[in-house]
């Protein structure tokens, strides 16, 4: 069995200043050549990818397989029961759009679960490298202090904190970053001792699009439109997807919602190009807010003139309230024993903010007074925002700020979630020509296909508690499965 701690220590031992400078120079060249930037910020700012052992990856896959039936059951129940659906706090226009049959069964053919995963065991490192410049870095934590902490009794900890069921970004970024890392001098040295396998994602996206299209009734070869505003910082990823789709023989354009018309039963880009398959990256809420419910794309999808992935019905589970629905004791009767065990194991205690009584730590309590009194134990999240917008970390807010945020949440739907451990690992970067290693917090975000299984993983690093590249700062790194060579 491969020991992750040993592998990372060995990688860092290979990364002297000379190899670090050479690797960083090559990475900088590749990031610019392939336009791997989020707006004007490079996607990756460190010199090591994320490593997982096969056992750790299988643990993630098993957990996703265990929890997804509960999400699926919640979605099916919500579609058929308006009273139950009210728990998701959909707006009036969302209630209208989820009535549109997308033409295929999965509400989210492409999705991502955002999690915090602290694998175990990680044995203490017996090796120090005092001669390395990294050890001299001001503010660097001592080796070992930032390693993922095990849970009670030494088990791994894995908590699902958000389900991105609408527009899961970065599969193409991940693929290209994997290629970039494979060619670095440091990886050439590391691969002599470890097998390193990537987790590609673009082909899964293409499969999901085509499966949905054929289910929808498409017979001709589709023309794909990647749909989002032209000014978004993720535009460079759309270019990567366009290049990939075209390499597989599919005509593809990148189109701004403002460029569409719906005329004579056809969805037209630039007024002339018929589109029958939409890879939707624009947020439905932004599309409706900026363009209205009579927008060409909304009309075309509603009238079965175009297939769209993900469909309007993805909004039900994309709401952060979906985790509250799973976690709430009032809904426990819906789930099988296996589903309930998965919820208890992986979903942190989560509730929609309201004046109510509920169960917490085995007792019935008044929700709002508890949240006010124990702010350091909770995080407050708007039900339908992205990029870290509106999130309030109770342990970083003063009492006045926290109580004001709670009051505001009574009017604008929000969830409160019990604080989870934030794992960290040491990652090297080049600072003023020398390799320096700092502990960085990280999340682990499995890609989920058809609401069923996991393949691929997004890893984000940060020195702040809010791990989100959109929120500013941070770094994306590709994730590899590693095994020590015999």
What are these regions (language model features)?
Residues 1-486:
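Preference for protein termini
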